[in-house]
Amino acid sequence: MESAKDTTSTSMFILGKPSGNNMESNEERMQNYHPDPVVEESIKEILEESLKCDVSFESLLFPELEAFDLFIPESSNDIASKNVSYSSNVEEGASDEFKTLVAQSVGNCIQSIGASVKAAMKQEQSNMEDNLINSAGLLTLHRSMLERLVLEQLGQLININLLSSASSQFVSCYAKMLSGKNLDFFNWCEPRFIVFACDKFDGLVKKIASESRDLLMDLKANMNNQFITALKNIFSKAYVALDSGKLNMVATSLLLMAHNKEMSNPEISNKEFCKQVNLLKQELLESRNEIIENHVKNMKMFQEFANKQMNQIFMDNCDKTFLKIHINCKNLITAAKNIGIAVLQSIVLCSNEFSWQYLKPRRHQFKITMMNMITHACECIETIYDDTGLIKPLTSSDIMEGYIAINKNRESSICDLNIDPSESILLELADFDEHGKYSEESSIESIHEDDDNVDYLKYMEVQSPTDNNIPTPSKNNESPTRQKLTNIHEKDVGKMYPDTPSPDVPGKSKEAKTFIEYSRQIGKEQTSPNCVCTASVTDLGGPDNFKSITGLESGKHFLIKKLLETQPDSVVVETGSGQQDILAYSPDKRSQTKEWIQEKGSNSKCTETLPGMTFTNSATPVKSHGAIQDTLNPESKLDKEMEAVESLVNLCDGFHDNPLISEMITFGYETDHSAPYESESDNNDETDYIADCDSTVRTNNIHMNNTNENTPFSKSLYSPPEVTPSKEDHKTEKIVAVSQKCKSKKRTAKRKNVPIKPSKSKKIKLDRLPETTNVIVISSESEDEEDGNNIIDKSMLEKTIKSEPNSESSSESDDCTSEDNYLHLSDYDKVINNGHCQSKGFPSPVFTIPIRSMPGTHDIRNKFVPKKHWLWFMRKTHKVDNCVIHSSAKMNVKNDSDVTEANHCFINHFVPIKTDDEEYEKENVSYTYSKIQDSKTDLEDITPTKKLITEMVMENFMDLTDIIKHGIAKHCQDLSSKYTVITHTACEKNLNVANSQNLVTAETQIFDPQGTGNNSPILNIINDTTCQNDENRCTEGTSNDNEKCTIRSDCNSDKMEVFKLDGYPSDYDPFEENAQIY
């Protein structure tokens, strides 16, 4: 009995105590997720207010119990101890005081029921609070993940121009339908109207993206508000009411015992009285357990219902929002595709009626028609979106309807020749005509109206009545042949500019020049001024048409002189398959805003932010060796010279307004060299200008030749075609008229570019290859305008041709190593591409991730997504001071005392850091822009990539910082004292190897800051990778030229040559910056 009493009384007083073990298991079992702070606090407040224990029965029971003195102010522990004393005195006999004390214990049990239930409810509330907060936090996490995915999708819509991307896959298909002047017209119109459509459609995309972001913000707010509202509604009904039935019964029994004097009746033994009290306590215990169990059961039900409600709210809101955004994104792609198709179809149909040279009489109507078509389509899509909230793409036929009609003969016709355009169209048309985004004044051949060209137009009006070679554009008129066009422009240009060596482009207004100069100055701050662009000109008519069609060879010497004045980097003229003429020269900073650079191409949309470029033109080969001599005759007529300038400028123009190329060069990315424009000409007397470019990026074969041949991957990544002399005549003429500089103004070093896949420029193999490969290397070394003395004139070129031994070409393909076939590169290119500076220089960490969103011109943004994993490189740069330039003694330069100091040596070596990566293969570094459209951003690849980059930099941060901080001075001193450059005298044979070998004559170790050691992983890799193959750089093939270049000092007879850093302020020092994490 005693044990029963002890157990019962003790259990009653500890029932309300929470279990610590249970709490720990709950915390271990639950993952810790948290919703937004407002939601979390609201959940706590709701449960605190709703889950209160109703103890109203106390007001009914306690007053009467107190009247009988059945409540005592003692604590439960005191009562327990008195119960113990009572049990020990049970056999001592009846006692009124003892029975009263026992009865009071029952009253105090009743009193403790409320507190016990409240404590149990408090624990249940805490568990429920944790559960609901965790559930809401998990849903919030899921919502955030979906939001990030949607934002990524929206970012891709903005960063990759949809319309340009969608239309690019159709450009080559449509181009194949055309040939001759129809293809010219297509190539002239397509980039302009596509970019106009891109700008129009880009506004719609931005609006969709902005409103989609608003939807995501609304989703967050709505979810949070609905969570709080739902929980309030649910738990407002979840109040806790004590089951007072048994409590009332026990209290009544206790009162009855007091009324009946059982406590003071001596006839009732202590044992009997204790039995009655224990029965009452048992009933109180059962009552307490029932109350708590029922409450827990109810709360679990409410909790489950609340979780279901929150999940339903999440699903309803997310489904509605994300489904809408997904549908709109998908439909935007379809809409862009249809608009692109409509524009291309319209241009193709109109190409039967117009040509780009003879669009002038009806160009106004044509352009307004096209612009109206594009604008109307975008406005219609936007109107539907405003009404329904969804994008409904128009079909391409709907877009074309009402503007372009097709008759039975499949010829095009502009329906409305009396168009009354809106004011907005007129404003856009003005921008289209003058200097802006879609300027058509891009070449000498295109005849356009302009205020600055009145005299020229008057001349044309006078010539038109008598010159039958200028037909009026009409559906029924045949397009003029290329020969006629050539003759026309020979006459026109010759009469317009009889005494001007470098004519301005007709139609190029002063405002345009100012605009472009300003754009270029701004672009210098963020754009690397060097790249190598390749424009392919394929003559499908055969070699016989060379003289009468292109006139490139006939004016080569004149073209060199003109291009030297405009100062791009180099011009490489490829003659035939794999054979090239190299015209390399350095840009003058003050002349980079010449009209030649400002011109816009007929095949691409361009940007004015590239101070210098290298253009490579795959030109038509000549018939014989005599033709080359004839075409290089300095006595060529002025009209042929101008014709050559026109032809090449027309082909090379238009690389500067390309937003993608500008941004890619800024961040050092490569682009593809594929040639989507292919056509087959039916006329053997016409030359089709085929742009090797992807319409998506509007590029004409961008090469960034900065691969390192001695790194494990360079050979496979970039392998230019081997140049082999023609077997018909081994008496080649090699023109080398320069003093080569190790550091020309082609600052490829400033770019953060990486190796790319081999270029596969599509060239037409001709029946007969030219007799020779003429390598013409020309340098302009001074940054001052007065340094025009370095320009090579025609007589000097002729003299140089004759001065070269004919026997050299027999071993031309046997340069120092079998891998060194870079004959289409200058010495400086070779040094950079082979760049292993033996002094190692100091490393500047350039860790790059090609996942970038970059603003292009005209609000067209570009995004680069890696194909797989990224490779890591360190860039090594050098700084040189007080190195004096002296002109070559062999060059016919008037002033031989020009001196320039070199501030920086921009010879970049991209040293691989992860050479042991199993994915370190060329297929993993392909960033072909057209393929990016099919790629997806894989977060699983991006996240570890960023993590890796951070860890690599942070683990070696002190070493890198010390190297950069302390290594500059030492390296500058060492490199200045050892820097030598070979100027070609008898060593033209070793053009690609000698300079790279003799760039620095002594081998030193990388500067190791005191205390850092040379044991960091990055530094070890640099030492390992940059030292390899240095000893045997020039061991093969030297036997062929032992009589020419047996002693290195023979090649070093000239003074040291470096030059001033171009394109940066004089006080700018890029090497004093600390290592930065991307």
Swiss-Prot record:
The segment annotated Disordered runs over 1-28, 464-483, 703-732, 781-818
State the coiled-coil residue ranges.
none
InterPro entries of this UniProt entry?
HHV6-IE
What is the top-level taxon of the source organism?
A: Viruses
Which regions are flagged for Polar residues bias? Answer: 1-12
Protein name listed in UniProt: Protein U90
Q: Which organism is it from?
A: Human herpesvirus 6B (strain Z29) (HHV-6 variant B)
